[in-house]
Amino acid sequence: MDFWLYKQAQQNGHHIAITDGQESYTYQNLYCEASLLAKRLKAYQQSRVGLYIDNSIQSIILIHACWLANIEIAMINTRLTPNEMKNQMRSIDVQLIFCTLPLELRGFQIVLLDDIEFAGRDITMNGLLDNTMDIQYDTSNETVVPKDSPSNILNTSFNLDDIASIMFTSGTTGPQKAVPQTFRNHYASAIGCKESLGFDRDTNWLSVLPIYHISGLSVLLRAVIEGFTVRIVDKFNAEQILTMIKNERITHISLVPQTLNWLMQQGLHEPYDLQKILLGGAKLSATMIETALQYNLPIYNSFGMTETCSQFLTATPQMLHARPDTVGMPSANVDVKIKNPNKEGHGELMIKGANVMNGYLYPTDLTGTFENGYFNTGDIAEIDYEGYVMIYDRRKDLIISGGENIYPYQIETVAKQFPGISDAVCVGHPDDTWGQVPKLYFVSESDISKAQLIAYLSQHLAKYKIPKHFEKVDTLPYTSTGKLQRNKLYRG
């Protein structure tokens, strides 16, 4: 199969592929620049490299260049400590890391993209021509692939079952797992998203989630497969993002719930040109859903994993209006089921589809990952009679107290409705009598007593679900994609 970028350069070459508000690259430009860089990357003779990158046009060119050079990319979370980075890269035998940001990491060959660009003056990232190759851009409507392009040097085709990217699970408990994502996985995910969410060549998708996470990288894959425009943004700033939404004909945006809250607080009270606001990474509160729908914001809740190459469950605004706690229904190209449901219908969520990884690269000795072709997500979920899926908690986060199963999410949802509490999380606390009891951490600017909280929670929860311990904190620990790091509270 021809590389998607190569096909877009042929068929959709004059369409804007990527813009950062200052520079814009058509698919023709992007393919030519990526091809030129790929030629240089081949000299490093690596089949797998680490990428330490930001949300920039340079980073996107680097990603495509690696793929054109048949190099697997292992994405590095830039917020990790040096030891965490070392452990991840060593676990999958990465020796060289390409960077668009400064990085010092002993024991690895670190190559800054700027050093590649200007090493021999035969490649730049600003459209300058190769000194040794007659690269010319054809601006006619008939031929959009650059004349004498490096396609005669680089292989323009690929195998769908080749590994495209490697990402590590967030690793909130236990060792981090290396997830290999093939081109087939990415393609199936993109097709599923198109069917359940909707996008086309006229889409203008604002992407501010980190590229090194699947939520960010998946937008780039959808774009190059479909041929739409990505408006790349490096850092989230509510005022700046709102200005872009108002002025740049943004049709799609991916956010975590907290960033949508900030945008609504900033003044996002109408959709403007927005057709789809894709939410994920954390649970939505009923209050936030109600507020967003009152503003006629086209919010779509979703659920996905690194192992499934992003979302495979999607809830439309209509679904959220009917049932705010749902993450929707599966894409048509995946199958989901509940393993060993209890009397309430709650059990472990299982998924099967071409978007699902084939198995972890590291550790290699994990058991129970797949059962009869279904991937075990590790999430406690329910599928109701209408086919709506509700995710309750990670199985590992379940609190078992005196033989009773307690879902932290249920307690957290009630606690967040207490006046003055802006955020809350419940974890299991060791107890000599019951094994575990719930402990609630909460964020508030008000003075709230334990007695007040117990009195309020008792109106909504069974007695055994009432937390036995309470702790007020300034903030709760979240990852860069908005996922709560419960392990830091377990240790705390």
UniProtKB/Swiss-Prot annotation:
Gene Ontology annotations of biological process type: menaquinone biosynthetic process
Nuclease among keywords: no
GO molecular function: ATP binding; o-succinylbenzoate-CoA ligase activity
Reactions catalysed: 2-succinylbenzoate + ATP + CoA = 2-succinylbenzoyl-CoA + AMP + diphosphate
InterPro entries found in the cross-reference section: AMP-bd_C (IPR025110), AMP-bd_C_sf (IPR045851), AMP-dep_synth/lig_dom (IPR000873), ANL_N_sf (IPR042099), ATP-dep_AMP-bd_enzyme (IPR050237), MenE (IPR010192)
Pfam families: AMP-binding (PF00501), AMP-binding_C (PF13193)
Pathway involvement of the protein, from the record: Quinol/quinone metabolism; 1,4-dihydroxy-2-naphthoate biosynthesis; 1,4-dihydroxy-2-naphthoate from chorismate: step 5/7; Quinol/quinone metabolism; menaquinone biosynthesis
Keywords linked to the UniProt accession: ATP-binding, Ligase, Menaquinone biosynthesis, Nucleotide-binding
Domain of life (superkingdom): Bacteria
Function: Converts 2-succinylbenzoate (OSB) to 2-succinylbenzoyl-CoA (OSB-CoA).
Classification via NCBIfam families: menE (TIGR01923)
Family (UniProt): Belongs to the ATP-dependent AMP-binding enzyme family. MenE subfamily.
Protein name as annotated: 2-succinylbenzoate--CoA ligase
Gene name of the encoded protein: menE
